[in-house]
Each structure stands twice: as C-alpha cells, then as structure tokens.
C-alpha cells in the first residue's frame, strides 16, 4: 500500500503557510482521486483512495512537531508493515521554491516534523517528497518564516510544483520508485 502523509498544522490559521505544503499536497491529491472512505482518529485523518493499487492519504492532526505520534497511531490502526511504502510530504527550506526532491530515506534535515517521525518509528527508512519553499530571508527567524503565508507570486509557483508532486505520486502506482525519483528530481517550475 502507498501511504501519502502530508505534514502540516491543523486549523484555518495555517492553511496557506509554508509549513503546510504537505497538507496542501493531500488536498490536491484528493482532487485527483475519488475517496473510497475516510477515517478520523484523534491524531490524524486518513482517506482511502480509489486507485489501481491500495493507497491512503493522511493528514496528522497533532501539529507539526508531534507528527510522529500520528504516524505511529496510523501504522497501528491500519496494521501497516514494512511492505507498505510510507511517503512523507513536507516543506524544505534548503530546496528552492519551484523544486522538489524525492528520496527513499534520509535524515531529518533539521525538520521538526520529520524528526518526530524518526523518533517515533525508530528509523529513517521511509520515503519523502520534499517540496522547496526556498531559504528564509536574513531579517526573519525560521519559525516566523515557515509559519508565514506564501506571497501571491510564491503561490503561483507553489501550485505548479504541487502539480508536479501529484504527477510523481500518480506514477508511483505503476513505475519503479527509483525511476520516479530520477525523473522528478531533475524538474523544476517557475
């Protein structure tokens, strides 16, 4: 089963903030697939996708820094195993806006949501789609930057890169993960 976990913060205050690109990814993914059923737990909401292979899309409801609690609960509730591919989608300040990076595993890269998942699971062995939000300006602290909203011009680029990420996700159903990774890691939008 493919398990797309979009990281973000719940609530209307965070909808279009940089830290919510994972939630925005899930919203866009749900527009491409019909929802077979949905499930809301205390720590997450999950949507079974009507697709060629079993898949779910998930939004943790624990706030970013506690995402690992939601992922741990999800794995328990759905009986997920090592045969299932967890794909965590999140913002990355080290990647320029308009680019994404797909990886099979890796460190937290300083991202607190990913750090929480690694801590809860005890492993870095899960896939990622890192969506670039660009570096923070010198005159603002990191928390203010990632919790700040995208500008109108940034949103235009973001919607394009989210389309790219959705295309990559759709190809993951049929293509080898390494091929998808190789193809999409070299593409950018403006």
From Swiss-Prot:
Keyword entries, A-Z: Cytoplasm, Hydrolase, RNA-binding, tRNA-binding
Site description Stabilizes the basic form of H active site to accept a proton, residues in chain: 91
Active-site residue numbers: 19
Reaction(s) this enzyme catalyzes, per UniProt: an N-acyl-L-alpha-aminoacyl-tRNA + H2O = an N-acyl-L-amino acid + a tRNA + H(+)
Keyword Cytoplasm: yes
Enzyme class: hydrolase
EC number: 3.1.1.29
Gene3D superfamilies to which the protein is assigned, alphabetical: Peptidyl-tRNA hydrolase
Secretion signal span: none
PROSITE patterns noted in UniProt: PEPT_TRNA_HYDROL_1, PEPT_TRNA_HYDROL_2
Listed Pfam families: Pept_tRNA_hydro
Binding-site residues for tRNA, renumbered to this chain: 14, 63, 65, 112
GO biological-process terms attached to the record: protein quality control for misfolded or incompletely synthesized proteins; rescue of stalled ribosome
Main location: cytoplasm
CDD domains: PTH (cd00462)
InterPro entries recorded: Pept_tRNA_hydro, Pept_tRNA_hydro_CS, Pept_tRNA_hydro_sf
Gene Ontology CC: one annotated term: cytoplasm
Function field: Hydrolyzes ribosome-free peptidyl-tRNAs (with 1 or more amino acids incorporated), which drop off the ribosome during protein synthesis, or as a result of ribosome stalling. Catalyzes the release of premature peptidyl moieties from peptidyl-tRNA molecules trapped in stalled 50S ribosomal subunits, and thus maintains levels of free tRNAs and 50S ribosomes.
Entry's family note: Belongs to the PTH family.
This protein's name: Peptidyl-tRNA hydrolase
Source organism: Kosmotoga olearia (strain ATCC BAA-1733 / DSM 21960 / TBF 19.5.1)
């Amino acid at each position: 089963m493919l398990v797309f976990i979009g990281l973000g913060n719940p609530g209307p205050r965070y909808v279009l903030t940089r830290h919510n690109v994972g939630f925005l990814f899930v919203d866009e993914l749900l527009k491409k697939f019909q929802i077979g059923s949905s499930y809301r737990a205390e720590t997450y909401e999950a949507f079974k996708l009507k697709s060629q292979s079993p898949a779910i899309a998930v939004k943790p409801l624990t706030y970013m820094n506690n995402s690992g609690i939601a992922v741990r609960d999800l794995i328990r509730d759905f009986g997920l195993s090592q045969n299932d591919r967890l794909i965590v989608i999140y913002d990355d300040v080290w990647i320029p806006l308009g680019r994404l990076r797909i990886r099979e595993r890796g460190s937290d890269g300083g991202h607190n949501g990913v750090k929480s998942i690694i801590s809860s699971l005890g492993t870095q062995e899960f896939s990622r789609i890192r969506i670039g939000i660009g570096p923070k300006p010198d005159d603002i602290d990191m928390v203010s930057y990632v919790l700040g909203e995208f500008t109108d011009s940034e949103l235009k680029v973001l919607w394009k890169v989210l389309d790219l990420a959705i295309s990559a996700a759709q190809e993951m159903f049929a293509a080898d993960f390494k091929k998808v990774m190789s193809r999409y890691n070299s593409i950018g939008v403006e």
